């Protein structure tokens, strides 16, 4: 691409680099200059303009952005992604359903390394997205790029971004109580909102005494495909009431504790084919906490190993909820 300032007499057919006010009105940047445009610019007192001209092997910014998007998303249905139209060198990628965004960072870094004028910016890996939520934007910075650079950027990029949708339809939240009083429904409302935005229904309310036998019985009778436990007393050890109840019911505990705050006291396990999440007390708040990161992956059938949870510590210091009984600074 050739870029620079030229006399008006040499500018016809070139791409205007900066918006200008002519005698007939504003000529937007990116416009292909016509003879009429040049006459209007001359009438406005311009003698020269800054323009770009594409060379034989260049791709226009819009065509380049769309071509790269199609290279990245070669299967819109399979990758669960919708490609937008192109404009001003930009194409956006949108989720076709709710879910979590999965990325191949190595492949995407290679896209951005091909040429400084060719860029893609994405949300983080495992980011929760709603239907029609934007998950990436492709921007060609210059008015055109060489076809060779565009080919290099797209090579190996196919399938490097996709949206994993939820696979479950229902969940049961089992709450325990430490007194005869019914717990406030704050936690149920917060969890119901989390499940609803991922397309899951919450089964009727279940409240049992904070005892292993009662909780184990509730787990065996729970109708949901995903089982959630919110205890009236914090779970502070792998041998505490809730993890022990899961084992007593015939389930397994695969992980207790996570390096995300708020969210440290989460535990993860399974009961037959059903995933089980022991929720930390912060799940009663709709604010982001460690349980969200685990819940969203579980609902989308993404494996969550102990190593995965251990890796959440970097970036795991989240905003403290206002109602926290013991704020960090006072501990």
Label each region the model flagged.
Residues 131, 141-228:
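Phosphate-binding glycine-rich loops and their immediate beta-loop-alpha structural context
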Residues 1-88:
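Short, low-complexity N-terminal leaders and the immediately following helix N-cap/first helix
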Residues 55-166:
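Extended, charged alpha/beta regions that create polyanion-binding interfaces
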Residues 43-47, 70-77, 131-134, 140, ...:
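Generic secondary-structure signature for well-ordered alpha-helical cores
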Residues 9, 13, 42, 83-86, ...:
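Solvent-exposed alpha-helices and their adjacent loops that cap or buttress functional pockets
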Residues 203-331:
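Short glycine/threonine-rich loop/turn motifs
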Residues 26, 32, 125-128, 259:
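Residue-level "contact hotspot" at macromolecular interaction interfaces
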Residues 32-33, 49, 129-136, 141, ...:
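Generic structural signal for buried aliphatic residues
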């Amino acid at each position: 691409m050739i870029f620079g300032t030229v006399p008006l007499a040499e500018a016809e057919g070139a791409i205007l680099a900066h918006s200008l006010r002519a005698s007939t009105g504003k000529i937007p940047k990116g416009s292909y200059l016509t003879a009429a445009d040049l006459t209007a610019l001359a009438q406005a007192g311009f003698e020269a303009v800054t323009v770009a001209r594409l060379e034989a092997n260049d791709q226009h910014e819009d065509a380049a952005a769309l071509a790269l998007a199609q290279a990245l998303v070669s299967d819109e249905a399979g990758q669960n992604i919708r490609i937008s139209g192109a404009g001003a060198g930009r194409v956006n990628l949108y989720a076709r359903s709710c879910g979590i965004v999965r990325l191949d960072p190595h492949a995407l870094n290679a896209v951005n390394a091909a040429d400084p004028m060719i860029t893609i910016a994405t949300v983080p890996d495992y980011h929760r997205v709603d239907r029609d939520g934007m998950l990436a934007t492709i921007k060609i910075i210059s008015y055109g790029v060489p076809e060779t650079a565009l080919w290099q950027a797209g090579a190996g990029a196919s399938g490097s971004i996709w949206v994993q949708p939820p696979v479950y339809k229902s969940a049961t939240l089992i709450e325990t109580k430490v007194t005869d009083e019914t717990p406030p429904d704050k936690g149920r409302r917060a969890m119901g909102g989390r499940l609803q935005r991922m397309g899951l229904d919450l089964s009727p309310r279940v409240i049992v005494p904070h005892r292993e036998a009662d909780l184990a019985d509730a787990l065996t009778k729970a109708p949901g495909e995903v089982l959630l436990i919110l205890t009236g007393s914090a779970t502070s050890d792998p041998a505490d009431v809730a993890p022990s109840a899961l084992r007593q019911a015939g389930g397994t505990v695969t992980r207790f504790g996570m390096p995300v705050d708020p969210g440290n006291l989460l535990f993860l396990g399974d009961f037959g084919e059903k995933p089980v999440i022991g929720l930390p007390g912060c799940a009663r708040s709709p604010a982001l906490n460690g349980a969200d990161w685990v819940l969203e992956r579980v609902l989308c059938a993404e494996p969550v190993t102990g190593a995965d949870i251990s890796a959440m510590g970097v970036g795991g210091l989240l905003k403290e909820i206002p109602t926290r009984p013991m704020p960090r600074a006072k501990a």
